UniProtKB/Swiss-Prot annotation, chain A:
<feature type="transmembrane region" description="Helical">
    <location>
        <begin position="138"/>
        <end position="158"/>
    </location>
</feature>
<comment type="pathway">
    <text>Glycolipid biosynthesis; glycosylphosphatidylinositol-anchor biosynthesis.</text>
</comment>
<dbReference type="GO" id="GO:0006506">
    <property type="term" value="P:GPI anchor biosynthetic process"/>
</dbReference>
<protein>
    <recommendedName>
        <fullName>Glycosylphosphatidylinositol anchor biosynthesis protein 11</fullName>
    </recommendedName>
</protein>
<keyword id="KW-0472">Membrane</keyword>
<feature type="transmembrane region" description="Helical">
    <location>
        <begin position="195"/>
        <end position="215"/>
    </location>
</feature>
<comment type="function">
    <text>Acts in the GPI biosynthetic pathway between GlcNAc-PI synthesis and GPI transfer to protein.</text>
</comment>
<feature type="transmembrane region" description="Helical">
    <location>
        <begin position="169"/>
        <end position="189"/>
    </location>
</feature>
<keyword id="KW-0256">Endoplasmic reticulum</keyword>
Curated annotation (Swiss-Prot), chain B:
<keyword id="KW-0808">Transferase</keyword>
<dbReference type="InterPro" id="IPR045687">
    <property type="entry name" value="PIGG/GPI7_C"/>
</dbReference>
<keyword id="KW-0256">Endoplasmic reticulum</keyword>
<feature type="transmembrane region" description="Helical">
    <location>
        <begin position="396"/>
        <end position="416"/>
    </location>
</feature>
<keyword id="KW-0472">Membrane</keyword>
<keyword id="KW-0812">Transmembrane</keyword>
<comment type="function">
    <text>Ethanolamine phosphate transferase involved in glycosylphosphatidylinositol-anchor biosynthesis. Transfers ethanolamine phosphate to the GPI second mannose.</text>
</comment>
<keyword id="KW-0325">Glycoprotein</keyword>
<keyword id="KW-1133">Transmembrane helix</keyword>
Length: 217, 806
């Protein structure tokens, strides 16, 4: 019900969007920090829970043969696009509007994601990944992370680079990777301790947490 | 420092020391030599099964090197195994799997204690001597047998030279040599085999171990080395009669990286083969029956019959009819009972009596009992004895822990009540909690460097995200930290081939350029403000450089020509007299000159400060201290001090702009993190094996003082930690409003909580498999950190400097 009210109310207030006080008292959750004006935010709703990630992680941990990261990434791509189209985009509010899916931007943000793998890989190496060895695997990890952040990248592009609000989505993926590193030094010698499998799972869990709860923060 | 803090610190140190004294007791050993106990007269009259023994110890000979298809290239041994003239075993070698404790096990049959592993490092120590301990070597010697020994000089350290009629030791110090260590041994063989004027011939080959250390278990040098050893075995086999027993064994195994010391399957599974022409006329061991060698891969390197390495001792003693050494835990290897004929039962009962006496158990009169049940009982006793090889002094353990918990509670109270709630104190508490809990996991102790890295990236990431205005400094800091991480391998699990240190070793010209740059940058720091002091620093830096190149020349490393000209020029200037000096003779006077010059500069500066109080005293002395630390660092690690300089300036920048309110508190916490991280990335680990002794003898002549060497060793291994500790104090003096004692509470909190949890972990895990290979070394390192960094640097040196600074 609320979802329908907001677009209706928006039309009245759109000319006042410069007026912070009005738009804040009107529609925004009280304690939400403002990111640019008009504000961009993700509604607090169960709609953003990434169920596909739960299934995918389960499949990756239990049923993928030998933890095939490549295959997992291939599977992840359509899931993420669908997630963006059906769940994340409808929940994202741009200056009090909910925008329709922009198919051109979908492709552009896909390319952006692939380009982002290079700086992402650089960051992963800076944060301690092996250098010169296993670069292919590190690249695969950064590709996976970038695909995981695809909805957020799309939204950043869609909102004229208002990184401020979507920063936490990227951070939650990074924190997921970081926490999962704890599994690496253990001397259990399990196949899943191989680089970069723990980090892939960590990134998925981080993304899961991020897409579910970041709108609440 | 205030009285309260000093008191707490002393109590903390005392508690840890008390604990350590209870934890590392000298093992009780039975004195005296064994005599036959059971039917002594009959036994004395027995004929031994063999007349002569040839023992070939091949260092780090893992079981699969001897037996496994595609791995082993001991073709002749395989042939003998198939003919039944050789009996193969996999011998479990009790950790710590390093040579000295293992040799003790092989000769005396006793389980090693942890002190032996430490003494393995201390080359010149003589307290591990087995002169007064019963072993089959001493039994042979007492029975008038002639023993000849060639190989690793650890044997000569263990046994008095009069045991060996002839000996030639090779030093295992230069691990990079694969060939000469072994040809040095083999060259004696033709003479020995021709004259046969010995009863026992012991050969200890080191080459295989060296190959493992250098290139891992699958190194390309392994197959030729196997063939070389195989040829040695064939040579001996061909020239001895069938009254000679040839035994080939590894003292321990190795893991796939080629290291050893721990308790993994690879490290503890050593190969053992008994070879004699006579053996083919006896039934071969059941596990070897119908098996064709080389055999296929087995899980955990378990090939053929599995025995304990110490079982070698009673077996040899029985076969050669000598009394079983008193402290032996070994159980006679059942397969050999057929060689003893009708006396087998006698010998096993003898072994039973000896073992029960060691276990201080009453022995029921065993006469014609069933051999199998007796052997089974002996195995049980052996297992119990091996587990309780060390007797902990529980009173001292609990006194230490109790005292430390009181101290920790007091420190925690003082710290928490005085700390303001800010990022620095939260970080400190988080680090303390994390490190404290990590000591309960053996892999986290082994891979502690990963935890510190994990913490530092979290801190940088957090700080970057919350203070985006300092992005360039954060990036610089991160790049430097990553360089530091890539400089050396640490821990046990991951060994990367392309570390910066390895690259620099293979490109000496770049290395020496970087060393020059480092020394110049460090020495000329603050040149514009105090040119005179900088020139003095430069002088010290120059001396340091000359010494380092000179050292490289002596040790066969490559140094560039400009450095060599510099050395010649400097030396003709310094040590006038015109006669050309040998580089080797120069080392000691050069190092002494360096230390004298630095001491003089420090004294001058202190005297100057006593007259004209200058606030910048500490930051002005800092470069000179850094040069001293550089002096004690291996040359491939020296450029890291350049990295540190950059890191320090970017860190100061971040703290100045991003954390103006808690600048010094933050620096103290980060200093603690960086101390540990850089200690590990200099190549240190929590294992005894990586203690670096190369810089411990700088300026030390032959009749040296052990305490000076110890101090130099500590500084050499802890140089980066001292650097960061001093760096924090420099900033403290310049910018802090708090007193040093108050500031110090945070690291006291860390050390006391960390120590307490480690002591608790040691008590909980005292019967854990890894107690000697992981937890005990960690306890030693904790002592080292406590004494050197926490006490000497941060409680003696730094307050003194602060006092002079006024």
């Amino acid at each position: 019900m609320t979802t329908k009210k907001r677009p209706v109310g928006k039309k009245k207030f759109v000319s006042f969007s410069d007026d912070d006080a009005l738009s804040r008292t009107g529609r925004l959750p009280k304690n939400l920090p403002q990111h640019g004006s008009p504000p961009v935010y993700v509604r607090r709703t169960w709609q953003t829970i990434p169920f596909h990630l739960i299934v995918l992680s389960y499949w990756f941990i239990k049923h993928s043969n030998g933890y095939d990261v490549r295959k997992c990434t291939w599977l992840l791509v359509p899931c993420q696009v669908l997630y963006l189209a059906l769940q994340f985009n409808p929940a994202t509010v741009y200056g009090n509007k909910i925008l329709k899916l922009n198919y051109a931007l979908l492709a552009v943000s896909g390319v952006t994601c692939i380009l982002l793998t290079i700086p992402c890989m650089l960051l992963v190496v800076l944060f301690g990944a092996p250098f010169l060895e296993m670069l292919d695997k590190t690249w695969l990890l950064s590709l996976h992370c970038c695909v995981l952040s695809y909805p957020a990248v799309y939204s950043v592009l869609n909102s004229d680079f208002k990184v401020g609000f979507f920063k936490k989505y990227f951070i939650s993926i990074a924190v997921g990777c970081w926490i999962s590193c704890l599994a690496i030094p253990l001397d259990w010698d399990r196949p899943w301790q191989e680089w970069p499998i723990p980090l892939v799972v960590g990134a998925q869990l981080g993304a899961m947490f991020g897409y579910t709860f970041c709108s609440q923060l | 420092m205030r009285f309260k803090e000093v008191g707490l610190l002393f109590c903390q140190l005392l508690a840890v020391l008390i604990f350590a004294a209870g934890f590392f007791p000298q093992k009780k050993v039975l004195k005296g030599d064994a005599q036959f106990q059971y039917m002594a007269e009959t036994q004395r009259a027995l004929e031994p099964a063999f007349d002569k023994l040839v023992l070939v110890v091949i260092d780090a000979l893992r079981a699969d090197f001897l037996f496994q298809q595609n791995v082993s290239h001991f073709d002749f041994v395989h042939e003998l195994l198939n003919r039944g003239e050789a009996w193969g075993f996999t011998a479990y070698s009790n950790p710590p799997t390093v040579t000295l404790p293992r040799l003790k096990g092989i000769t005396t049959g006793s389980a090693p204690n942890f002190l032996d592993a430490i003494l393995n490092v201390a080359e010149d120590d003589s307290s591990s001597n087995l002169k007064d301990q019963d072993s089959w070597i001493s039994q042979f010697a007492k029975h008038g047998k002639k023993i000849h020994f060639f190989g690793d000089d650890t044997w000569l350290k263990l046994f008095p030279e009069e045991f060996f009629q002839k000996h030639d030791g090779t030093n295992s110090f230069f691990v990079s040599d694969f060939e000469e260590v072994d040809t040095n041994v083999t060259r004696h063989l033709p003479h020995e085999l021709q004259h046969k004027d010995w009863d026992v011939l012991i050969l200890h080959y080191l080459g295989l171990d060296h190959i493992g250390h250098k290139g891992g278990a699958a190194s390309q040098f392994m197959p030729p080395k196997h063939r070389e050893m195989d040829a040695v075995i064939r040579q001996i086999y061909d020239q001895v009669d069938n009254r000679t027993l040839l035994c080939v064994m590894g003292d321990h195994g190795m893991n796939d990286l080629g290291n050893h010391g721990g308790s993994s399957a690879g490290e503890t599974s050593a190969g053992m083969v008994f070879i004699s022409k006579m053996l083919s006329s006896y039934p071969r061991p059941a596990a070897q029956d119908g098996v064709s060698s080389p055999v296929t891969a087995a899980e955990d390197y378990q090939f053929f019959t599995r025995i304990q390495q110490v079982d070698f001792v009673p077996t040899i003693a029985s076969l050669f009819n000598i009394p079983i050494p008193k402290n032996s835990l070994g159980v006679f290897v059942r397969e050999f009972s057929s060689l003893l004929g009708q006396h087998a039962t006698t010998k096993i009962i003898e072994n039973y009596h000896q073992l029960m006496q060691l276990a201080a158990k009453k022995t029921a009169a065993r006469g014609n009992d069933d051999i199998d049940s007796m052997l089974a009982e002996m195995k049980d006793v052996q297992a119990t004895l091996a587990r309780t090889a060390t007797n902990y002094n529980y009173a001292m353990l609990f006194l230490g822990v109790g005292m430390l918990s009181i101290v920790t509670a007091a420190t925690a109270y003082c710290y928490i009540s005085s700390a303001r709630l800010n990022e620095a104190s939260v970080l400190m508490i988080a680090v303390t909690a994390l490190l404290g809990s990590s000591v309960f996991g053996s892999s986290f102790v082994e891979e502690e460097h990963q935890i510190w890295w994990w913490i530092i990236i979290a801190v940088v990431g957090y700080s970057w995200a919350t203070r985006p205005s300092c992005t360039p400094s954060h990036l610089v800091f991160l790049v430097c930290a990553r360089l530091l991480r890539g400089w050396n391998n640490s821990g046990q699990k991951f060994m990367y081939d392309f570390t910066v240190a390895e690259l620099l070793k293979s490109h000496p010209s770049i290395k020496w350029l970087l060393v020059c740059a480092t020394l110049a940058v460090v020495a000329l720091d603050g040149f514009t403000e105090r040119p005179l002091l900088s020139i003095f620093n430069l002088l010290a830096g120059l001396l340091c450089f000359v010494y380092k190149t000179c050292w490289a020349n002596v040790n066969g490393e490559v140094s560039p020509t400009y450095a060599q000209t510099l050395v010649t020029k400097a030396c003709s200037l310094l040590f006038a007299g015109g006669t050309p000096w040998d580089d080797k003779q120069l080392l000691v006077p050069l190092a002494r000159l360096f230390f004298k010059v630095t001491a003089a500069i420090v004294c001058m500066r202190i005297a100057y400060n006593v007259v004209f109080a200058k606030r910048k005293f500490l930051s002005e002395l800092f470069p000179l201290f850094t040069i001293v630390l550089i002096m004690q660092t291996a040359s491939q690690n020296i450029p890291l001090f350049l990295v540190f300089t950059i890191m320090r300036s970017s860190l100061r920048n971040i703290l100045r702009v991003g954390y103006p309110q808690q600048r010094c508190e933050m620096f103290f916490v980060l200093s603690l993190i960086l101390q540990n991280l850089s200690f590990f990335q200099f190549g240190g680990t929590n294992s005894i094996a990586t203690i670096d002794l190369t810089n411990s003898y700088n300026g030390i002549s032959e009749n040296y003082n052990i305490y000076v060497v110890g101090l130099l060793m500590c500084i050499g291994n802890m140089a980066p930690a001292i650097y960061w500790s001093l760096a924090a104090v420099v900033d403290h003096q310049l910018y802090s409003k708090k007193s040093y004692a108050q500031q110090k509470l945070s690291s006291m909190f860390f050390y006391s909580v960390n120590s307490l949890l480690l002591l608790v972990a040691c008590i909980c895990m005292r019967y854990h498999l890894f107690i000697w290979s992981v937890f005990s070394p960690k306890l030693c390192y904790l002592l080292g950190w406590n004494i050197l960094i926490h006490f000497l640097t941060e409680t003696v040196l730094e307050p003194f400097l602060l006092m002079v600074a006024g």
